[in-house]
């Protein structure tokens, strides 16, 4: 089962993308594989014009379709998730997240933007028909810091939320995998019994 790490930040480097990478590292430690997609690397004209014929857009949509779970990270600007992420989500089919697990992550300047995930992003994600949207993880700029010497540093409460979110995602993926229908195997005709 593949997990897609979807970075919705228009800039690089980005706190939200670094938080997303950290979640990816935690998932690898639990034995999961992931693919990465940075929306800012897609052609802007194609996204804004909803050009589904663009090769990069087709490949990106295919990556979303093939994933069992999507971890979406975005910065919060003016009490909403990034516009480039919204433009990309608008390209997905009506039920583009069907049967997928979704873990939303966001970073913002202050705690006052914390509800942006629940009031702005979650309804859009829910409209795409995911199997389950896990509890969101929001961190302020002060809670997610970066330096060349020490790399990414998370405040203890955020580190705990990330551990919990990754554990929930991993457990949910395992449950989905166990519940998935197994492939049928051929049965020799001599073993088939029919009654009339």
Describe each region flagged by the PLM:
Residues 7, 38, 136-138:
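Residue-level recognition of beta-strand->loop/alpha-helix junctions
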Residues 36-55, 145-149:
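N-terminal beta-loop-helix "entrance" segment that forms/cooperates
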Residues 8-10, 39, 107-108:
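Cofactor-binding loop segments of dinucleotide-utilizing enzymes, especially the Rossmann-like FAD-
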Residues 52, 56-129:
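Helix-loop-strand module that forms the ligand-binding subsite of alpha/beta enzymes
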Residues 1-32:
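N-terminal beta1-alpha1 ligand-phosphate binding loop
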Residues 133-196:
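Glycine-rich phosphate/pyrophosphate-binding loop and the adjoining helix
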């Amino acid at each position: 089962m593949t997990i897609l790490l979807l970075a919705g930040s228009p800039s690089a480097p980005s706190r939200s993308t670094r938080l997303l990478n950290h979640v990816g590292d935690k998932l690898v430690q639990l034995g999961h594989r992931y693919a990465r997609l940075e929306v800012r690397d897609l052609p802007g004209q194609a996204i804004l014009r909803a050009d589904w014929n663009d090769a990069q857009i087709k490949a990106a949509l295919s990556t979303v379709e093939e994933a069992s779970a999507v971890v979406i990270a975005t910065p919060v600007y003016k009490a909403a998730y990034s516009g480039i992420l919204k433009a990309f989500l608008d390209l997905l089919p009506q039920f583009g997240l069907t049967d997928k697990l979704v873990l939303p992550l966001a970073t913002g300047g202050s705690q006052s933007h914390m509800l942006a995930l629940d009031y702005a992003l979650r309804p859009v994600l829910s409209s795409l028909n995911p199997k389950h949207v896990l509890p969101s993880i929001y961190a302020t700029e002060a809670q997610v810091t970066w330096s060349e010497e020490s790399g990414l540093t998370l405040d203890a409460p955020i580190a705990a939320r990330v551990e919990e979110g990754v554990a929930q995602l991993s457990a949910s993926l395992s449950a989905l995998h166990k519940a998935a229908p197994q492939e049928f195997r051929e049965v020799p005709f001599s073993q088939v019994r029919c009654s009339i």
